[in-house]
Amino acid sequence: MMNRIITANLANLASSLMLAQVLGWHEPVYPDQVKWAGLGTGVCASGYRPLTRDEAMSIKGNLVSRMGQWQITGLADRWVIMGPGYNGEIKQGTAGETWCYPNSPVSGEIPTLSDWNIPAGDEVDVQWRLVHDNDYFIKPVSYLAHYLGYAWVGGNHSPYVGEDMDVTRVGDGWLIKGNNDGGCSGYRCGEKSSIKVSNFSYTLEPDSFSHGQVTESGKQLVKTITANATNYTDLPQQVVVTLKYDKATNWSKTDTYSLSEKVTTKNKFQWPLVGETELAIEIAASQSWASQKGGSTTETVSVEARPTVPPHSSLPVRVALYKSNISYPYEFKAEVNYDLTMKGFLRWGGNAWYTHPDNRPTWEHTFRLGPFRGQGEQHPLPVDKRYIPGEVKWWDWNWTISEYGLSTMQNNLGRVLRPIRSAVTGDFYAESQFAGDIEIGQPQTRSAKAAQLRSASAEEVALTSVDLDSEALANEGFGNVSLTIVPVQ
């Protein structure tokens, strides 16, 4: 029994079905588009043209494998390609049949289907909904296995692929397999092919943020700082009064479901702003979403005013310090990634393994599904290069297209590759501190005695009667508070 375990990023199959848009001798030619026509030398059906010599050279192995031992088939410009009995020789000549290629190839792109959104829940709930959905999951992956050549992808009580399937929990994953109860008829019909879904991971989508009703406190007065800006000179003085402080933002979140423990963030991102509460929250990358329960951020902020103080006068200065808080329920979408492992014996009458074995080997193959699977890894087979001889080392996608049709494979792979998302929900709370503007009052003339006492000082301007309790402010989240005054130079 032959066993293989191979991993691949099935998302790359989208590019594997991309067809040439503008054809020329230098453009890739995909063998599944080449058709045989027995209409005479160099004659093709409407909408087709003869394959050129250079195009035939690029896919010679595929063409020769489709020809009889002594077959000779025409190409453009009086060239022919000869069958395996002639070692696939390409030379000048004529033939009564022709290899043809479409003038306007049909686009082979995989359709991008709308996201499948699974309701928020614990991890096992999300997985259960995924693997038990017949239309969105069981049938598409079952048909993929069938198209690749796996035998008996269905249960004993239905003649159709992907029906009468049992889903069981196995370790950290799920096993989908045809029901084997009762009798069945057919070679090795009791050996049902299986599809294992495992190795789940979930990646947060920062741009998918949404929130419910917002509860916001508005600004609440914490403390008012007061002082006097005093001018001891005989001339008016323009001054700069500056309040400088470290502003703290404290935040926390709670998660509704345990799925959040398995969700990770791919890149760091800023928590979206909601309401009027000022926040600057950065969520780290490559960490469990549940582990990021909260934190605090600090930034230094300055507020200033530039009043002119009359001679021998004071201007009252006042700054109000506030705090505010906000809370709301939130939701982010999370991309679901997983491994899809097919195992069973391949049909002798036709399978898509690149060697097309006819001895019914048992084969195991793992596709890695999801937008964040396989990124950065060296892919052993660039399947978008299926037109290059020797590059097909796993599945022969040209064969599947020839066997089942381009549109069938497009539709099936589109359904298998449909993005799957669930939701991460919870409640968010944050508190922020901030200062209002510096308010300047009306000038107050200093008494002659006070001016005389100060006349010996070198200071021309100063802050007097300062009411600022640094320790009390620090307890309220305002650190390193200072209030200064300097004359404008």
Swiss-Prot record:
Site positions per UniProt: Important for heptamerization: 391
Positions of region (Interaction with host N-linked glycan): 70-86
Pro-peptide positions on chain: 445-489
CDD domains for the chain: PFM_aerolysin
Any one GO cellular component localisation term in the record: host cell plasma membrane
Main localization, broad class: secreted
Positions of the record's site feature: Important for oligomerization: 157
Entry keyword annotation includes Membrane: yes
Oligomeric and partner information: Homodimer in solution; homoheptamer in the host membrane. After binding to GPI-anchored proteins in target membranes and proteolytic removal of the C-terminal propeptide, the protein assembles into a heptameric pre-pore complex. A further conformation change leads to insertion into the host membrane.
Function recorded in the entry: Secreted, cytolytic toxin that forms pores in host membranes after proteolytic removal of a C-terminal propeptide, leading to destruction of the membrane permeability barrier and cell death. The pores are formed by transmembrane beta-strands and are approximately 3 nm in diameter.
Family: Belongs to the aerolysin family.
Protein name per UniProt: Aerolysin
Source organism of the structure: Aeromonas salmonicida
Organism lineage: Bacteria, Pseudomonadati, Pseudomonadota, Gammaproteobacteria, Aeromonadales
Gene name linked to the record: ash3
